[in-house]
Amino acid sequence: MKEMLVVGRLKEGKFEKFMGFMQSDKGMAERKKVADVTKTIGAVSPDKKAVMFKIFVHNIDAMHAFVDRSNPVTKPVWDEVMESFEIFELKKVR
C-alpha cells in the first residue's frame, strides 16, 4: 500500500455536496476500490474551499480514475464540485 496525500480545491459552496457524495453508499463503494477507507484521515479548510485526505492506496490506477474524471461514477460529481486537485506520494523519513 502507498501512502498518498490528495488536496482538492472545491467550487464555491460545494463542500456539502462533495461530502454528501464521499459519505454516500455510492461514494464509499468507489473509495473502497482505491484505498483502505478505515485508515483515511481527512481535513477541511475553515472556508470549506479545500479538502485534504491522507489515504492508503491499494490501486493506483483506480485512484487516478477516481480523481481525474475518467471514473463514470465520480465524474458527474467532480464536474459539479471540484476546481482542481493535487496528489502527493508520501514517504516516511524516520
Model-based region annotation:
Residues 1-75, 79-94:
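Short S/T/G/P-rich N-terminal loop/turn motif that feeds into the first structured element of a domain
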